[in-house]
Amino acid sequence: MTNPVFERIQSEIAANPVMLYMKGNAMFPQCGFSARVVQILTHIGVPFHTANVLEDPALRDGIKQFSNWPTVPQLYVAGELVGGCDIVTEMYQSGELAALLAEKNVAHEVSA
């Protein structure tokens, strides 16, 4: 039996090199953790798409099951889960996030 939420997530991740599942949207994040990841991605200058888990309870639960990761936000780069706010922040500060984007050939302004 197919899971329509998983299919949606797989489709969004496949269609968008940088996909962020978050509370709110890029213009109006609804939690501090989501806002921090948006701030980092914006500072790096990488185009990204978002999905607001607050608009769809099935998506909110489904993304956690899909990734086996208990929290939101969740950042995906080139189809792979990078992590949540703490991991993204650490990778940004160390230069690993820019290096990952370069390795995956994802256009961004800040180099490693």
What residues fall within each predicted segment?
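Acidic beta-strand-to-loop metal/phosphate-binding motif
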Residues: 21, 74-78
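TIR-domain catalytic/interaction hotspot
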Residues: 7, 60-65
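Local sequence-structure signature of Cys/Sec-based thiol-disulfide redox active-site neighborhoods
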Residues: 10-47
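Thiol/disulfide oxidoreductase modules built on the thioredoxin-like
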Residues: 65-71
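Non-catalytic, surface beta->alpha helical segment in thiol-disulfide oxidoreductase systems
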Residues: 77-109
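Thiol-based oxidoreductase modules, predominantly thioredoxin-like and allied folds used
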Residues: 42-60
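Flexible, polar/low-complexity N-terminal or interdomain linker segments that lie immediately upstream
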Residues: 1-10
